[in-house]
Amino acid sequence: MSHKAGFVNIIGNPNVGKSTLMNAMVGEKLSIITSKAQTTRHRIFGIVNDEEYQIVFSDTPGIIKPAYDLQTSMMDFVKSAFSDADILIYMVEIGEKELKDEEFFNKIIHAKIPVLLLLNKIDKSNQELLEEQVQTWQAKVPNAEIFPISALENFNVKEVLNRIVDLLPLSPPYYPKDALTDKPERFFVNETIREKILLNYDKEIPYAVEVETEEFLEDEKIIRIRSVIMVERDTQKGIIIGHKGAALKKVGMQARADLELFFDKQIHIEIFVKVNKDWRNNAFQLRRFGYNQK
């Protein structure tokens, strides 16, 4: 058997470009992207297929100190990424210090599997700073191969992909060869709506929100979607809806445009807002939304 396959798990601090990298590798927007921390909440697989190999990339939440139960569940996803990886990608950006979480950083420097340290956002750097950063990270993570990249500009991404293929273990594919991800359609509807909330609202509002798609009906030409935005308090519900529903309408229009590109079909979407009190600290609700796996 000459076929290769393996899990390549991407970890790092918030906003270092993990989701941008996976989307670039896969060639599809599977992970939502905003400038806000904690945009990625779940562990999302993106699958790259070739006749001779299959790479299962795993995007993970940025590493933080949990402040409530939802964030604890998010960090559990990161822990699971250490346990099943064949190759670990530790992603940092120019000027960044190592992970604040000592436990996770120790797991990286003592990993028994290949570690690729990707020094991202080099388009915002100069040659002198870049060389200094490479030396700094070589000293901090001596077990890692270092690749300066720009995930946004797609610089050096192909070289990283080639190195991953070199390092993959011999294995049959883990997923069908036409698979792109492990997530269902409704997950991407939920995430697209949540991305628009992250982009259109400030302060605590985006972090108090969860999205659930109650209806996804697809026929030959159109997909009919009914989704619900969950918030924790009535005041948040009013802010999400906005004056005469204008803010919610804007979210719906933006989400529909993205979903029509993603599914390549006409989309009819209805979005409602409900209060789900303190869902971020409710074990039952976290399980319902796919966070608490315990």
Task: Annotate each predicted stretch with a short phrase.
Residues 1-76, 80-82:
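Conserved G1/Walker A P-loop phosphate-binding module
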Residues 31-33, 100, 172-176, 199-211:
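Active-site phosphate-binding and catalytic loops of NTP-dependent enzymes
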Residues 40, 63-65, 97-98, 125-126, ...:
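Catalytic P-loop NTPase motifs of RecA-like helicase/translocase cores
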Residues 185-294:
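P-loop NTP-binding site
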Residues 52, 76-144, 217-219:
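Conserved C-terminal guanine-recognition region of P-loop GTPase G domains, centered on the G4
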Residues 114, 123-181:
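Canonical P-loop GTPase G-domain recognition
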